[in-house]
């Protein structure tokens, strides 16, 4: 039974509704000279990436899961002409660095597009060749090789990061890198204007105007009482504390503890969910480097102290022990990516072997290419549903990264 359009009180409850984004033309606007700035290491082949993503969506639908698409919800959210106009203004305001004062010309282009085509174009980016103009600004003479007025958003198929469902509410996130910062504008408009969400009084635990960075890949809902959040390159301690204070005080929240876990700052450890995901009541996939750090980790258990009327923070250095304590489980099993092998583990970690999507307790969706990790999961009693991902993985994200649960059954 659900009480609204958002209900996520665990990482493992039966998945009922999920938000995806099908890869689009934004991937074809990736070029080698600008890969770093757009946070990509390689260029996926769009046709095959779409086939792989369609297969992923079909697997979820075959499991009885309702699949919603970000791009479709966004288009349905701007049917009102005033909302559409404000949306365009907001997008252009956040793209001012690249549009070079050509708002009028870009708006003219947008005026010819249907709502769905407009959303697709904003996501894909606007090439300079699409708008024929004479140079009127010095920067255009000096920087005329840069090909975009509106940068593409190739990371959008990772719907986990711009937002996160927590309990009955969501965080609408301020992303760390400028290349991704506009992404959360879509969910912001969806929550405010889409018929499915707008009148549901969905709590925003963190909004996108928060001055501190937080990303959904670092946000794990361990239970109705406990959140785990990675302190990473992309999620700040300040954002975590702000979120903790908000959910501790709000009567619509059931959360009592926030476990903040410091992870290394590197692309291999991009978010907490690339190094640790919950897959059953007592099992987690884990990067072997985290296991080697046991006893030397920085873990902080944040709770609200009613007497002091403030938060209190307890330090721990053991991940396994901390998880057992906060989840009240006698024995937690941490399953290493690639069986902890120096070669297999590193290869499969690079290919998101620990970034699994749990669709119900003990059942996960993974990339088929991570065969060592998948076999190890099966040996631990986990049902593994494999999907192809040779092109999708080029964006450095797995099934959890590519999905945002909106409704899970309570455990």
Curated annotation (Swiss-Prot):
InterPro entries, per this entry?
Answer: Arg_deiminase
Please give the GO cellular component terms listed in this UniProt entry: cytoplasm
Which Gene Ontology molecular-function terms are recorded? arginine deiminase activity
Q: Which SUPFAM superfamilies match?
A: Pentein
Q: What is its EC number?
A: 3.5.3.6
Q: Which residue positions are annotated as catalytic?
A: 401 (amidino-cysteine intermediate)
Check the record and name the Pfam families matching this protein.
ADI
Pathway listed for it?
A: Amino-acid degradation; L-arginine degradation via ADI pathway; carbamoyl phosphate from L-arginine: step 1/2
Localization, per the record, is: Cytoplasm
Q: Which UniProt keywords apply?
A: Arginine metabolism, Cytoplasm, Hydrolase
Is Hydrolase found in the keyword set? yes
> Any coiled-coil ranges, and where?
none
Q: What class of enzyme is it?
A: hydrolase
Which reaction equation describes what this protein catalyses? Answer: L-arginine + H2O = L-citrulline + NH4(+)
- GO-annotated biological processes: arginine catabolic process to ornithine; arginine deiminase pathway
Give the family per the record: Belongs to the arginine deiminase family.
Could you identify this protein by its name? Arginine deiminase
Organism encoding this protein: Staphylococcus epidermidis (strain ATCC 35984 / DSM 28319 / BCRC 17069 / CCUG 31568 / BM 3577 / RP62A)
